[in-house]
Amino acid sequence: MIDIFIKGGFLMYPIALCSIVGISLIINKFIQYHQILKEAQLSLEEIINKTPKIMQPIIDATKKGCNEKEISVIGTRQVRKIEKGLSWLSLIATIAPLIGLTGTVTGMIKAFMVIEHSTTVNPSMLAGGIWEALITTAAGLLVAIPIHIGHHYLEKRADDIAFVMREHSTNLYMRHRNGI
């Protein structure tokens, strides 16, 4: 495995970094979203009594008598906090194959340089550049595909959280407005 990494050339390092950062973000967000969604399943009474961290600013605004628009702005701010980091996953899923493609180009340049500087070309002389081209392309795609899937999954979960938060916010506002 290390031999393949080395044959991929210097661009394997940024591809590996993309993989590490992407997987770390996915794991972090998955745990965060799981906890938030677990709290979001609480009833309105439980939310008021337990006050999940994500709902705290909304509950505080409701108790202060903020209007529906103000509560909506606070809710949007909370959703943005939840979504923080998702754009990095999108970026990683986009640039990993581009880095791989750059490795394809540099590998093919190396192969053509061998052809240019040799009077007779032996296929094994071209192998290094071709190895680099193929390995970096594959590595870029192997990083991008699961990161893209993780990004899509987490975006859906963030949308679910935002929906539940809006629903609870509306219910809290209506309850407070009606004096319940």
List PLM regions with ranges.
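Predominantly long cytosolic amphipathic alpha-helical stalk/bundle segments
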Residues: 31, 35-121, 147-180
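Alpha-helical transmembrane segments of integral membrane proteins
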Residues: 12-25, 90-97, 143-147
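Transmembrane alpha-helix/interfacial motif
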Residues: 3-42
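Membrane-interfacial hairpin junctions
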Residues: 3, 115-117, 123-127
